[in-house]
């Protein structure tokens, strides 16, 4: 893959931390999304760590940062059936130099792995957050196990799986050498 075709942008003035979530943070994230997509019209996927946070950010984007004449938005919903999934992905089959499609989806969900949107079907992915899983007894057992082997258990139980989700989602945009 030609690295000159890649733009890697990082916004370090926003966060997806649960304790900082709210209307102001959602609006700042929506502004970042607007800034990214204003550079080039086309189809984008925006991945967020949960359905609730996806709703907050998508609502903020659609309300204050979306030119509805030139931008369409769609959202992943919980418990999507096969036809709904196909319809969601089907929206990405066309692209335009004058119009954008923004798909909001959940990081680690059905659209962040195993989909193949080649060429201009998808020109950008925006990952919001690190994908670190919630604390649970299973992950805590993994953390304790790896801590006991002399390595950082938190990295193995939380950081690596989270970053794997981020990399999988980012990989949706580069499917061929021509992308």
Please report, for each region that a protein language model flagged, where it lies by residue.
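ASCE RecA-like P-loop NTPase motor cores
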Residues: 1-179
